[in-house]
Amino acid sequence: SHHKPKLQINITTGKWHCWVSNQGGHNLFQLFKKVGASNEHFSELGGLVDDIPKYKRNTDTSKEVVQLPKEYKPLWNGGDSIVKRHALSYLYKRGITDDDILRYDIGYCDDGLYSNRIIIPSYDSDGKLNFFVGRDFYNGKMKYRNSPTSKDIVGFDLFINWDEPIILCEGVFDAMAFKRNAIPLFGKTVMKTLQKKIIESRVKIIYLALDNDAIVDATKISEYFINNGIKVKMMKF
């Protein structure tokens, strides 16, 4: 019947399905990415999702399951506390905007194992959680306490356009600062899953943005991809 909806969206769970293309997904950001939404549209989404719980759990039992800490609270949504204010202050000082907070689903914990940490999730191309970073915002002895799961993933895959040049950088804050097509390595080496994705996606140009103390690592990465027919450009800071 012509009354059947062409696009169905559950704003409570974020799940969507297009009856024309028979495609579906787990969250609204994935849908926005598919239709080529601009940054302005992502900002507008911010005004709509105030009370929508975001996708937080990967229920795929065939792989290692990544879960956000149970104490995780989104920074873009409701509530106020001194800890939340300090978390936001830390992010603003590092150049992270409200749009970034919404786009990357950034949250925080004020209790538990990840207490006083900003939580930055990473989602795969299907919108499933594949890793998260926990950064202490009171500058305690242990700066980072990350997901206990493997780093052998593609960081921020949900936001990557593989038809364009990509940027490889060390951390999530670097990746967010670049604003466009940047993949955090969660370190100084390119893991197998990311290597494979880059080769299979036929990426033509890689911009390598490692810290100055990582010359040896950068050279190894560069040689590997050049040997695979990919142009590599070093970025200096």
Model regions and ranges:
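A residue-level signal for conserved active-site and pocket-lining positions in enzyme catalytic cores
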Residues: C18, L91, G127, L208
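TOPRIM metal-binding catalytic domain and adjacent DNA-binding surface shared by DnaG-type primases
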Residues: S1-K4, K33-I119, Y123-D126, I160-N161, ...
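Short, acidic/turn-prone active-site loops that include or flank metal/cofactor-
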Residues: F186-K192, L210-D213, F237
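Phosphate-handling DNA/RNA-contact segment within nucleic-acid enzymes
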Residues: Y104, D110-I205
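A generic structural motif
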Residues: G46, K231-F237
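Short Cys/His-based metal-binding microdomains
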Residues: P5-S43
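Acidic beta-strand-to-loop metal/phosphate-binding motif
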Residues: L168, K204-D213, D217
